[in-house]
Amino acid sequence: MKIFSGSLILIGVILAIGGCQKMKRPPLGEYPQDYTTTPTTPLRFYVPFDSSKPEHSQINKRFRDSISDYPSFFPASNVKVIQGVRATAEFGGSVVYNNANDWGQSTSFTVAFWEKNTVPVGEPQWLFTLPSKDGWTNSNFTAYVEHQAAGSTSTDAVIKLIWGVDADQWLEFVGPNKMPGNLLNNQWHHLAFVYDQTTSKITYYVDGAALTGLPSNLTDITKNGGPMGPAQFKTPTGFVIGGWSKHGGFGGAQDSWIQPWKGGMDQFRLYNKALSATEVAALYNSKL
């Protein structure tokens, strides 16, 4: 009977140890998380690309969102770390995230970042995307830079923004309205896109200064023939820096001409407010 009892105890210990081993989880931050963080300031998502902490030595952790501290997915092997505007930056492709925290619920917003690139040749390159689970584009808001044959030069860039899951509104910097500022001269430049729900207008900033004199089809955001009011992103999912929805595996068009950003990205910020001109200038002047 003692032998039988001892055997039962031994089996119980082995099962307990085995159960503990099976339930062991990887350390926090080992993989991208699949739930959202609710930030406490208007800055809802922020990727500085420059952590030098030993625990962030893996590239996906260096490229983490510093608000939630969650890493990105591992980027493609061609994505590298380069010298940025403050410390290090990302170069060469897309960086994908499970989400942008709760930024997709914003009613006013600001997208701000630093970029460095030459003129795309042959195909457009994507700047960023807030993907969606719906619509033929599978994206709520995205922006890209056209290639040389489409009119981009080192001094004036053809930039296009698409708002809405069914490409409801196109905001196209083309012809006489190409975006100035030497954005494609292979130097770092700061861009900010600011939407204010009280005016239903979007303001564009290049190197801390607002672009003025733009036609209404570049500034006025509409819905059903009237002002948009609060921004309305539909079923947002994930976020892609330097790519469209396809680069993050979120569906949408899969054509080969849809290319990731092949230059540099740094200090990528998403706010749930319309930053003022003074606040945008401060980001530029402080290299934030």
Regions from the PLM with identified roles:
Residues 29-38, 90-109, 175-181:
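Short surface loop/edge beta-strand patches of beta-sandwich-type extracellular domains
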